């Protein structure tokens, strides 16, 4: 772990609280400010490793909590984890089965591996957001909610516009726990319209 991480006050706070990553505080703030997760919601976390958002979700809902990632996630009580690509129809079918056929909320803190080239990284993050939106439109029940991470840039407005086709309330939100200088911004989408037409492919 690099020194810039260990000197990070949010990181130290997360480790002291028993969270697997500092990102836990981002979801806690999003929930406090936006009320995305309700007490009995079934929630799917995309790109869930190492599992800090799953830890938060487990405490926010008595519903089913399912984490999906290409990499294994260390087990935790009250959480189902799936190793696989969430864009794979077979993985999506298993997610539906684990959720009992009803998914109330989709969240994603997933980020592409960054190259340091701002425009390239932003385009890849937008692509990942498109995939998460298409997934949410496939599995969410009407009235469901979604939170996905993206990066500010020239394509961000297009992803917001696409999301508004499928949710009644959509806004961008930057958390206080985000690192200074980071372009990351979360899309908070509430009240899914129940339609998934045109939610696939490039913007």
Curated annotation (Swiss-Prot):
Alphabetical keyword list: Cytoplasm, Methyltransferase, rRNA processing, S-adenosyl-L-methionine, Transferase
Gene3D superfamilies found in the cross-reference section: Vaccinia Virus protein VP39
Catalytic activities: uridine(2552) in 23S rRNA + S-adenosyl-L-methionine = 2'-O-methyluridine(2552) in 23S rRNA + S-adenosyl-L-homocysteine + H(+)
Main location (coarse class): cytoplasm
One of the record's GO cellular component terms: cytoplasm
Active site: 149
Any GO MF annotation of the entry: rRNA (uridine-2'-O-)-methyltransferase activity
Annotated binding of S-adenosyl-L-methionine, by residue: 51, 53, 69, 85, 109
Cellular location(s): Cytoplasm
Matches recorded under SUPFAM superfamilies: S-adenosyl-L-methionine-dependent methyltransferases
EC number(s) stated in the UniProt entry for this protein: 2.1.1.166
EC class: transferase
Function: Specifically methylates the uridine in position 2552 of 23S rRNA at the 2'-O position of the ribose in the fully assembled 50S ribosomal subunit.
Protein family (similarity comment): Belongs to the class I-like SAM-binding methyltransferase superfamily. RNA methyltransferase RlmE family.
Stated name of the protein: Ribosomal RNA large subunit methyltransferase E
